[in-house]
Amino acid sequence: MKDQGVELIEGIDKLSIMGLSRVVGRLPYLLRLKRKIKILLDNRGIDLVIPIDFPGFNMSIIGLAHRRNVKVLYYVAPKVWAWGSSRIAKLMRCTDSLAVIFPFEEEFFRTRGCNARFVGHPLLDWIQPLSE
């Protein structure tokens, strides 16, 4: 995305956090990042927020964007089909569209009122040439 001219607030490399102990250890960083994003949303005239994966953090960011009437395209939507549907209402309310990476997710989200579109899985584009 950066190569296409999108301004990144933070790179995915710094947000790849798995496991409760790692999240707790990175909590001060995540809180500072959330404050930074809130300030940017308030002061920069941002047109679109594209959160990528990481629902533990990004679900709060989509709420911030929604309250400021900033459009949200959530790429790699939360796996509510696996972890429970409690996030669907917020996704419906706070996103303009979801870019989903598994074919079945498009129908799953659409039947629940979300504007979803299957865009393919980024790893499949990389793996397919290896198998040929």
PLM segments and residue spans:
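Active-site and donor-binding regions of nucleotide-sugar-utilizing enzymes
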Residues: 1-131
